[in-house]
Amino acid sequence: MSLIKIHGHIGYDRFSEIDDASDRELFASVHAWADGLHGSAVMLDGDRVFGRLVSEHGVFSPFASVNVVGDDLRFWPHQYGHGPVPDHARRIAQSFGAGTYEILRRLRIGVVGCSGTGSVVVDQLARNCVGELVLVDPDHVEDKNLNRIVNSRKEDAQQRRLKVDLMAEAVEELGLGTLVSIYASSLASANAIRAIASCDVVFGCMDSVDGRHMLNRLATFYGLAYFDLGVKLEADGEGGVDQVCGTVHYLKPGGSSLYSRHVYSMEQVRAAGLMRTDPATYRELRREGYIKGVAEDRPAVIQLNSLIASMAVNELLARLHPFRLDPNGEYAVHTISLSHGIYDHHCDGEPCELLSRHVGRGDVRPLLDMPELSVEAAAA
């Protein structure tokens, strides 16, 4: 557990000598009662927040950044570096301001799933000059992926290249300064979870409901802004199409969740998790009618993936640099149906009863309070 003391200043953007003395006195007692990292923060009248860690010996270390994950996304780094904007970023600065460009350069963003929507998200984030990308995907490129994974080639499928390797190479070849870390595993890996937990923002580009549920849980435990992407293309079996649609969810810690928004049921999460961890038992229970089958290998096309990926990246930019006429709180869910000519958006719902009690818990044992991750953590 960590304790943060916070108070306000009017027009004084640093800690005072009185703050130094009171923090040393207070946190000497705090450290005696509770292990862990503890700190002190100041909120300015201009709405900015800064802070510092206070050691048990009264030594101060500034917070690298203070992040506020709400309807708007606010990031206040300890040091602002407003250097010259390079030529390749000038259009970004012209569109959203030099301040937004500086924030993008400092962001560490996770992308879980690097196939259809994920590959487009990675490409757009890199071209928007994000500071670092953390990519998670266990799969390799196949022929069936070539029509929807940006930057993939026939030889990548022939060589069975990992999708994360392909994405990392493409980003590095752009030469725009974005760093890339890759994890060729599912999210259900201790190393992948810790890497995503260290991000500021995460994009979920997965089909599996157990992966989406785990990522929503991770974002809750570690206080991350979470953008979830979903696409659906349903054929009618007779050469036509029943439905072409997609959704972008923005989820903030302590708000509603994918589960409470009825994106999936816990029965579906259980079935998907069982299919991943114990396929034989999954097939047996499905055959006996105890669980419903999990949809596999859904159809997808690059134009629908690109549309939904663009909506998601624009949603990030709208929350960093609010440009809409209406408040961001009215855009927790975007739904678009190309088959039915519908675009709609909704505000956040009630806090999720399942996840809200886990907000900000951070590192626990087992990771995310999920028994299946205890073995992973022990092996890591």
Segment roles from a protein language model:
Residues S2-F60:
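Active-site-proximal loop/helix of nucleotide/amide-processing enzymes and allied scaffolds
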Residues F50, S55-I109, E330-Y331, P371-E372:
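N-terminal charged helix/coil linker that caps or initiates catalytic domains
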Residues L135-G175:
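Glycine-rich phosphate-binding loop and adjoining beta1-alpha1-beta2 segment
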Residues V164-D200, M206-H213:
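A structured beta-alpha segment of the ubiquitous adenosine-cofactor-binding alpha/beta core
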Residues S306-L325:
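Internal hydrophobic alpha-helix adjacent to the cofactor/substrate pocket in enzyme cavities
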